[in-house]
Amino acid sequence: MTVALVQMDIAWGDTRANIRTAERLMLSAARSDLYVLPEMWNTGVNPDPRSLPPLRFAQAQAEAPCPLQWMQQMADRLDAAVAGSMAVSLPDGTYRNRLYFVEPHETVNGKWLNGKWYDKHHLFSYGGETEHFTPGGEQVTVEWRGVRFRLSVCYDLRFPLWLRNRDDYDALICVASWPSVRMHAWKVLLQARAIENQCYVLGVNRIGHDPYCDYSGGTTLVDPFGQPTSCPDHEACVLTQTLDLKRLRSFRRKFPVLEEMDAIPQVLT
């Protein structure tokens, strides 16, 4: 499987501009099986989603409007899955930081069917995210073209128990808006999650700046041995890599770390 990790600048609150940027970059890496966009790729991350145009859940379910509709159109056009997170307003008045995993040909008469998503569990209290967003409570794994992907968003990366692999996924996706000031931690944590879980890790981060932070990128694919391949810092980039499941499974058989992990209750007690 070929994956394309899209490192892009995000225009603050300008969905149309961000769609144009993402589309141009994605088309430069045609023939991939999966495209992954950064956290809140359509607006940029804002701790108060009321000041940005959130995707309304009811509309997303019924009509798949822009930008979710655009993700579906690109999935159809490229015959590939497209993943990326955005702020979503639910009917109960709460907001979620929702990572959508959109597969091709999932709409019938304009209605989105069989949608898959993950709501960010660990909200970034340091940045005020807990004041307006509601955390998700479920771990989500999606299978696409024979590869099992665990979904996560940004701050989730710091919590290894939440991302513990029980041999139920092959690759971890982490979409982020991770600031330059903590870039060393980002790179180390991506490698740590790959090594301890014997999996591929797809870490997708943005570049540029917003009213709160500067972002240098660091979009990286880490293989199960902990070897990283990264985009250049501060540059728009599409990192394309192949996930080799045969090699992954052979490694797990020969070096069965997942079979010998402590049970979570034992760790906690």
Each model region followed by its residue ranges:
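Short beta->alpha transition motifs characteristic of CBS
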Residues: 43, 100-103, 118-124, 220, ...
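Active-site catalytic loop in hydrolytic enzyme cores
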Residues: 59, 63, 89-166, 182-188, ...
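Short polar catalytic/cofactor-binding loops
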Residues: 7-12
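C-terminal beta-strand edge segments of enzyme domains
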Residues: 116, 141, 206-269
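Extreme N-terminal starter segment of soluble prokaryotic enzymes
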Residues: 1-5
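CN hydrolase (nitrilase-like) catalytic-core segments centered on the catalytic cysteine
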Residues: 62-83, 157-239
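Cys-nucleophile CN-hydrolase/nitrilase-fold catalytic domain and related Cys-dependent amidase chemistry
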Residues: 15, 23-111, 179-193
